[in-house]
């Protein structure tokens, strides 16, 4: 009687309020999709970076987004703002795009290796630049190593969540599954270069290859709204877990009232 009155409600509360973790063994299939931070304004794909015009498109709010395919490709879109508490007009903002291949190690670590020629960053540092009204646009390449990650259903938001742990074990902000399959630009080199000798024939050949590559990318961008990617918020698996929890709660409540 005492157990049913005091301990069953506590156990059920913990059951229904805790994150529901799945897939104990790390695998690429559980990573597949586009994962975006809580601001829900930063997404990978052509809406963030236009490789034909080499244009970074600034989102409405800061945030981060990572997309993964199940065959080892990734893309990242980062919009970060670092405030200056002493002078609010000196905030540093950066918009960063990279894509490439990732490796999932046996210990659960993630190693992201970008395509060096494709990374781009737009940096605004008004208090440390000659012209505060202008931002700096540069090539950017930075490999990344994440210590580990977890994929689970957040019971509060009811969404699939990706929790990444940085190299030092600290948590990144949680990312929520937005699209599956992922929304990404082509996984090939978007801005290829060639270091061959600069003869006329070589330059013509390289120019032709780059032109063909850009045409493929352009066609991909034209088809961006024909993607079969779906926004993933509620899933059948989560519904089963949720209704199982509701059934357990109802059963325990009935037992509690019948015993009184």
Curated annotation (Swiss-Prot):
GO biological process, one term: 'de novo' protein folding
Intervals, Lumenal compartment: 25-240
Membrane topology: Single-pass type I membrane protein
Matching InterPro entries: Rot1
Residue ranges, Cytoplasmic side: 259-260
Cleavable signal peptide: 1-24
Entry GO terms, CC: endoplasmic reticulum membrane
Family per record: Belongs to the ROT1 family.
Role summary: Required for normal levels of the cell wall 1,6-beta-glucan. Involved in a protein folding machinery chaperoning proteins acting in various physiological processes including cell wall synthesis and lysis of autophagic bodies.
UniProt cross-references to PANTHER family, sorted A to Z: PROTEIN ROT1
Name of the protein described by the UniProt record: Protein ROT1
Organism: Candida albicans (strain SC5314 / ATCC MYA-2876) (Yeast)
């Amino acid at each position: 009687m005492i157990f049913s009155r005091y301990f069953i409600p506590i156990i059920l509360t913990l059951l229904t309020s805790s994150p529901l973790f799945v897939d104990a063994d790390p695998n690429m299939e559980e990573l597949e999709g586009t994962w975006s931070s809580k601001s829900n304004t930063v997404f990978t794909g052509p809406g963030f970076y236009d490789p034909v015009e080499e244009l970074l498109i600034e989102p409405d709010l800061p945030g981060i987004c990572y997309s993964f395919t199940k065959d080892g490709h990734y893309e990242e879109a980062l919009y970060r703002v670092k405030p200056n508490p002493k002078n609010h007009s000196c905030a540093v903002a950066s918009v960063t795009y990279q894509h490439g291949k990732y490796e999932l190690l046996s210990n659960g670590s993630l190693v992201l290796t970008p395509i060096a020629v494709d990374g781009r960053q737009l940096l605004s540092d008004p208090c440390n630049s000659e012209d505060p009204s202008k931002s700096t646009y540069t090539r950017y390449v930075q490999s990344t190593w994440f210590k580990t990650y977890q994929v689970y259903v957040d019971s509060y938001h009811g969404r699939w969540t990706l929790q990444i742990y940085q190299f030092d074990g600290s948590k990144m902000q949680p990312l929520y599954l937005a699209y599956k399959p992922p929304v990404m630009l082509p996984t090939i080199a978007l801005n290829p270069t060639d270091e061959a000798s600069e003869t006329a024939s070589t330059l013509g050949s390289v120019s032709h290859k780059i032109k063909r590559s850009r045409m493929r990318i352009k066609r991909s961008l034209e088809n961006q709204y024909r993607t079969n990617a779906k926004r993933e918020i509620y899933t059948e698996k989560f519904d089963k877990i949720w209704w199982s929890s509701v059934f357990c709660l109802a059963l325990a409540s009935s037992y509690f009232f019948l015993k009184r």
